[in-house]
Amino acid sequence: MITDKTECNNPLFGRILTAMVTPFTENGDVDYELAIKLSNYLFENGSDGIVLCGTTGESPTLSWAEQHDLFIAVKGSLDASCKVIVGTGSNCTSEAVEATKKAYDSGADGALVVVPYYNKPPQEGLYKHFSSIAKSAKDLPLMLYNIPGRTGCNLLPDTVKKLMDFSNILSIKAASGRIEEVTELRAICGSELSVYSGDDSLLLPMLSVGAVGVVSVASHLVGLQLKEMIHSFQSGKVSNALAIHEKLQPLFKALFMTTNPIPIKAALELSGWDVGNPRSPLSPLNNDMKKQLSFILNSL
């Protein structure tokens, strides 16, 4: 239930949200049992919440039924204090509305709604799209997701400001790769909007200009270090935060040496988590890249 947008200043979803991979069996089926184990491990190792069925979770290759079953399995296994946010975005408004309603009815703590991809709507179309979603589940907190490098469409701060008239639009995952995106959003939308970095490597710089946390890939591996970095920054120990940031940069870079989530799935395998290969059209990490990744993991 949403009561007051000022909750965003003590962010409703927490500081570290792991964009969790979707584990697959050797046959390519969703491995729900392993998803339960992994999500609980993440919560015990620095994550305040879990984001399911996003980019890292390979949502384009999951059926709506698989996404629903994955949420039910994970949500039912976690402590109630761990927020579970579900990706419900689509480039078809009616599909996104239906998925968001279902997430709300199933007990999700929030929904991650990506900017429509491929069809490249104008700002008016984006406003109508997100308005329809917000109206469909008025008590479900929504996190907008701006990632123009994948969608081919940029959600502008002025449009976000208009969307904040809806009480359940509380936050945004800023994944344009531009630090100034945070500054622009805060200048126009104010501190009521919680801005999350969508890029681990930009977390510390974005914190310095007003971001509240991160939707992270690296937290699969270094969640406690990320938690320490954020705490250090918030408590004025900036030099310690910077030291952690610098130490983790090779990992941040390696996890995007090719298309996400290919590297993180390989990294988890190297760390003892047999989460399976990505579904086609993504392919497994090649051997040369896997050797580079192994070297970096061993140096942490």
Curated annotation (Swiss-Prot):
CDD domains xrefs: DHDPS
Keyword list, A-Z: Amino-acid biosynthesis, Cytoplasm, Diaminopimelate biosynthesis, Lyase, Lysine biosynthesis, Schiff base
Top-level taxon of origin: Bacteria
Places the protein is found: Cytoplasm
Keyword Cytoplasm: yes
Substrates-to-products reaction catalysed: L-aspartate 4-semialdehyde + pyruvate = (2S,4S)-4-hydroxy-2,3,4,5-tetrahydrodipicolinate + H2O + H(+)
Name of the top EC class for this enzyme: lyase
Binding positions (pyruvate): T56, V215
GO cellular component: cytosol
InterPro entries, sorted: Aldolase_TIM, DapA, DapA-like, Schiff_base-form_aldolases_AS, Schiff_base-form_aldolases_CS
Pathway this chain belongs to: Amino-acid biosynthesis; L-lysine biosynthesis via DAP pathway; (S)-tetrahydrodipicolinate from L-aspartate: step 3/4
Active site per database record: Y145, K173
Site (Part of a proton relay during catalysis): T55, Y118
Enzyme Commission number, as recorded: 4.3.3.7
Family note: Belongs to the DapA family.
Record protein name field: 4-hydroxy-tetrahydrodipicolinate synthase
Source species of the chain: Prochlorococcus marinus (strain AS9601)
